Amino acid sequence: VAPELYEGLINLQHRGQDSAGIVTFNGRFNVLRGSGFVREAFDETAIKKLSGGIGIAHTRYTTAGSAYGLENVQPFLVNSPYGIALVHNGNLTNYQDLKVELQDNDHFHCNSDSDTEALLGIFASELRKTPPSDHFFNILTTAVTGVFEKVHGAYSVVGVIANKGVFAFRDPHGIHPLVYGVRDKNGKKEY
């Protein structure tokens, strides 16, 4: 899936982009991040080494955090709960408050200046608090509802949960819309 993600990034890039990242999953997360335009950030050899049947990718135009250094480049990952990789587009207006809440309540350290890392921390915290269910979708929607209650601003989110699959959601007001594609491949739907 990495070559398709790479091609998608090339089609999404724009003049203000300063970095890009890709994560795939094959039983473990495989991450590649780089600075500059997509073709500058990655070489095709590195792309081919990203194994896995699912993945997400992101091109970054700096709106929060520094444009320098790879610590602010998405996707961001956490190992617990489940293992989550996440990217987002938008701006969180209460980002600084979220960082304090994560540190004080969850002992979660944000290692970057990116509001995406705080969003991931809140999502992981909400997933961790959600009671078990026979249907993972119920767990996911309960966690996203918790995100809506805490995270203010405009955002669209796409992520991967280890051994569960891809998920997506947007802010409850639809300020940053989200579009996904579906195709039929060998009689199965791919999103």
Annotate each PLM feature:
Residues 1-191:
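Conserved short alpha-helical segments that host acidic/polar catalytic motifs at enzyme active sites
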